[in-house]
Amino acid sequence: MKITCTDLVYVFILLFLNTSCVQAVFSDDAFITDWQLANLGPWEKVIPDSRDRNRVLILSNPTETSCLVSSFNVSSGQILFRNVLPFTIDEIQLDSNDHNAMVCVNSSSNHWQKYDLHDWFLLEEGVDNAPSTTILPQSSYLNDQVSIKNNELHILDEQSKLAEWKLELPQGFNKVEYFHREDPLALVLNVNDTQYMGFSANGTELIPVWQRDEWLTNVVDYAVLDVFDSRDVELNKDMKAELDSNSLWNAYWLRLTTNWNRLINLLKENQFSPGRVFTKLLALDAKDTTVSDLKFGFAKILIVLTHDGFIGGLDMVNKGQLIWKLDLEIDQGVKMFWTDKNHDELVVFSHDGHYLTIEVTKDQPIIKSRSPLSERKTVDSVIRLNEHDHQYLIKFEDKDHLLFKLNPGKNTDVPIVANNHSSSHIFVTEHDTNGIYGYIIENDTVKQTWKKAVNSKEKMVAYSKRETTNLNTLGITLGDKSVLYKYLYPNLAAYLIANEEHHTITFNLIDTITGEILITQEHKDSPDFRFPMDIVFGEYWVVYSYFSSEPVPEQKLVVVELYESLTPDERLSNSSDNFSYDPLTGHINKPQFQTKQFIFPEIIKTMSISKTTDDITTKAIVMELENGQITYIPKLLLNARGKPAEEMAKDKKKEFMATPYTPVIPINDNFIITHFRNLLPGSDSQLISIPTNLESTSIICDLGLDVFCTRITPSGQFDLMSPTFEKGKLLITIFVLLVITYFIRPSVSNKKLKSQWLIK
């Protein structure tokens, strides 16, 4: 077809309309989708700062092995800084020679540290021979300054001892935590043990200024509750009503009348103005993301269980806002599980041998039942055996086990020992620092089948079972179109053993059914056991981290990839080759593997694997660093088959997502998901990943002393447009294009007719 000048003009007009009417702006979500709840823990001691009356030093022991020291502004309720000490403080006193210096002592180890009271700089430390100190007073104020009478708190005048300020005590008042009357006056009350309220003077009145609740410290378990759009529920009801109709005509008439009523309601809401209706349909408020949060699965409630026996719901799209909180009145929380598919009920196990069933509602959950286990022992751990049969394996601190079955029906929340023995076998693997143990549950009895114990000079430092994922591909397609088949045997676990005598780290891959070790790999580069070690097990690969001293001190990352065979197109698990997986009879092929070691510039504390709905998105290794930051690395960078760029063959470069081997992996600033936040994860923190309705997006949360959540997109946000995308201009552009097409269509038809008759 011949192109004329007129056609070119039309093309330029279309391009102009496209560029002028459509503007897609993609903005950074930093500090918009992520949030942090910083905690101090229950206040053990409050120490005034002599150089600033508005500042105090707060000591708390959130864990059994560490102490948290925080500088706090009592006038504004703002946290100024926090510092975790690697030991608990038994004594804290002022230096006799310098009252601006604080001496912290651990009596069991005689370890002491001397800090500047104002900015908490470490001045001196040692073992034994601590500096001479002055004992701190038990209270932060004099007893004759405050009195409590008839449910009122009176602040007394220093000379007349008459009440200068009066305050009605809040419900649940426990004690006066801190008080000073110098300008400005500051008063802190402790309420319900975990709540702290700050007051200041406004004339003759005491007014509340700030409030904190420290119940969230030390999260031990979590559950996620999806929030659904009420309109989806209404739509489901309409569809069910249509399906229940007697005939096709009745179903059609029901849909027609329902949609007509919706149209009338829409017109009423907009005062029967077509212009308002059209504007509402085109408008898209970039700040209002309620609908998109519901649609894309961002709207979730994070339910957390704390060590001190509190359970609470946090709104994940509203910066972790507390929706509800419930005191379970137990000594310690251990584990909790959903008891039904609809997520209407939770069961919580406590450390003292009780279990509670909790009905979860939107407003305030209620405790339905509270019962002791059949064996009144201290609970160490709880494992869910079967999601549908509500069976749990409870391990006590004396190593005994209890098989527990819960009937989630109404008024029957009691433990039941099944009378009908199941013919199926359930295999369970447990581990501790002394070894790994295999059990079989048969006929409602628990029997140990195998045991892998370590010797006295060894310790198991990390353990991970193979992650259950959606299987998308059986193998890796190479550059020459051949396939390396993944080793997808599900009953696998990987663990690390530290040998203090020989200064080695040993990686083992074990079959959890038989206890057979399939792969072992030893590292003799002088691992430093003072630093943390961790391991994660993905679909067909394992990644573990440790710190070594040779040849130079550095953090190591090791990846191990498992294949059925390292020979392309060789698949040993094909049923046509008369091969079957049966580990109990010894019919199992050991995996062949490739491994690579990388250097990482920061010390890694814990690791986790990103999860998405269908597991299509590239997996990311999410890492919590020792410095309090959280970052992630796409798994494709940790390639065990990678070679240096100069050694890569031509076919290897054609492989999808192939990356050359680089021994040092730098930290990408764009992948630091905590940004400049001061995050205190704690010694037993959990790094978790929660899938959303968007395949590209995963929610990452760190649960410990603090709670932090954000979203990551390891493969980019390929399935979501920005809220600022200008939908109205796009529709106008399409409309203008249709109009132009309508008017130029006769001209094009006329040209075609003339060309057939050879008319110029």
Curated annotation (Swiss-Prot):
Keywords: Endoplasmic reticulum, Glycoprotein, Membrane, Signal, Transmembrane, Transmembrane helix
Residues carrying a glycan: N73, N106, N192, N202, N420, N443, N574, N578
Role description: Part of the endoplasmic reticulum membrane protein complex (EMC) that enables the energy-independent insertion into endoplasmic reticulum membranes of newly synthesized membrane proteins. Preferentially accommodates proteins with transmembrane domains that are weakly hydrophobic or contain destabilizing features such as charged and aromatic residues. Involved in the cotranslational insertion of multi-pass membrane proteins in which stop-transfer membrane-anchor sequences become ER membrane spanning helices.
Anything else known: Present with 2840 molecules/cell in log phase SD medium.
Bilayer topology annotation: Single-pass type I membrane protein
Transmembrane region(s): 724-744
InterPro entries: EMC1 (IPR026895), EMC1_C (IPR011678)
Quaternary structure annotation from Swiss-Prot or TrEMBL: Component of the ER membrane protein complex (EMC), which is composed of EMC1, EMC2, EMC3, EMC4, EMC5 and EMC6.
Similarity section: Belongs to the EMC1 family.
Post-translational modification remark: N-glycosylated.
Taxonomic source organism: Saccharomyces cerevisiae (strain ATCC 204508 / S288c) (Baker's yeast)
Signal sequence residues: 1-24
Protein name: ER membrane protein complex subunit 1
Cytoplasmic side: 745-760
